Curated annotation (Swiss-Prot):
Biased composition (Basic residues): 122-131
Family per record: Belongs to the tRNA-intron endonuclease family.
Protein name according to UniProt: Probable tRNA-splicing endonuclease subunit tsp-4
Biased composition (Polar residues): 170-184
Gene encoding the protein: tsp-4
Entries under InterPro entries matching the protein: tRNA_endonuc-like_dom_sf (IPR011856), tRNA_intron_Endo_cat-like_sf (IPR036167), tRNA_intron_Endonuc_cat-like (IPR006677), tRNA_splic_SEN34 (IPR016690)
SUPFAM superfamilies: tRNA-intron endonuclease catalytic domain-like
Enzyme Commission number: 4.6.1.16
GO biological process: tRNA-type intron splice site recognition and cleavage
Organism from which the protein derives: Neurospora crassa (strain ATCC 24698 / 74-OR23-1A / CBS 708.71 / DSM 1257 / FGSC 987)
Molecular functions (GO terms): lyase activity; nucleic acid binding; tRNA-intron endonuclease activity
Length: 315
């Protein structure tokens, strides 16, 4: 892990009770270093009904946010309040700095575009159809001319030279010559035209804060942390009938192995729930995992967490 990632603080924006990450670098960091996938929720304004490929922002579980806070690699910001406060108190220097950062991003986008265009042109250069070779000109051998034909050719040449001279005189008289041919014509100054961009974050305008609003403590947090610490990746499990879908590695590489539910230590679990969850897990080729943590007492803190897997063997 690089030193920049060691000092990295992920900004989690709390908006309307949801925990969102807008920076793509933060998204890559928490996925690569902390095994957190979460869910992309962004969509395109031109096509809001599409639900196949979603983009930024990334919405975190409350368990994700709490776990990152406990590891001291993130902070939670009250986004609406911070933006309103910063916009009201922004001075000229901060505003110029923000505009300069936007211009830098536009220049970077232009460089990336130019590089991609050059690579595309070089790639397709060899695929273009080669030009057909020009037919060679055959110079006829000199033939002896008769006196009459020689006189005719000489007259035609003299007439062409006279016409050319007359044309040169007419052109020179109608158009004045340039006094200084070595001086190139000056081109008008063109203002640098950069591509327009839409910033995905406002980090350049808002400084890194340390505000950490309270994160509601869910009962599923112990099981969630237990699985994450053992290298499992967790995604929503509604489509498989559980609270979580549990993967042995990155979901880009593996199928889910478990559908998981969290229960309280003393919570009564109906037998029908065990049967239906076990049968459902087996039907979708997964094991049903359930777990709970022993609560804290006066003599000890929150203790061990126990997890069990159930498979329906009669199908």
């Amino acid at each position: 892990m690089s030193s920049t990632e060691d000092d990295r603080q992920v900004r989690i924006s709390k908006i309307a009770g949801r925990y969102l990450v807008f920076d793509i670098d933060d998204v890559a960091y928490i996925r690569r270093q902390h095994g957190i996938c979460a869910v992309f929720t962004g969509t395109m304004p031109q096509n809001p009904t599409q639900n196949v490929f979603l983009g930024l922002p990334l919405e975190l579980y409350a368990e994700d946010a709490k776990m990152l806070l406990d590891r001291k690699v993130a902070y939670i910001a009250d986004d609406p309040l911070e933006h309103l406060t910063q916009l009201k108190s922004m001075d000229d220097e901060t505003r110029k700095s923000y505009l300069q950062s936007i211009k830098t991003q536009r220049r970077t986008a232009q460089l990336v575009f130019n590089e991609a265009k050059a690579q595309s042109m070089a790639k397709h250069k060899d695929k273009r159809k080669p030009k057909q070779p020009q037919p060679s000109v055959v110079v006829p051998t000199e033939l002896p001319l008769s006196a009459s034909s020689a006189d005719g050719v000489a007259a035609a040449v003299d007439q062409e030279e006279e016409g050319g001279a007359e044309f040169l005189l007419e052109s020179s008289s109608s158009k004045p010559l340039k006094t200084d041919a070595s001086t190139p014509p000056q081109k008008p100054l063109v203002k640098e035209k950069l591509p327009a961009i839409t910033p995905t974050t406002s980090n350049a305008m808002i400084s890194n804060g340390t505000s950490n609003p309270d994160v509601e403590n869910h009962t599923a947090l112990p099981l969630y942390s237990y699985l994450n610490e053992r290298g499992y990746f967790i995604t929503p499990g509604l489509r498989f009938g559980g609270d979580f879908s549990v993967y042995p590695g990155d979901p880009f590489r593996y199928h889910a192995h478990y559908m998981a539910n969290s229960y309280g230590w003393d919570e009564k679990i109906p037998m029908l729930d065990l049967v239906t969850s076990g049968r459902l897990g087996t039907a979708v080729k997964k094991s049903f995992l359930m777990g709970g943590q022993k609560p804290a007492t006066e003599d000890s803190e929150a203790g061990e967490l126990r997890a069990f897997c159930i498979e329906w063997a009669g199908m």
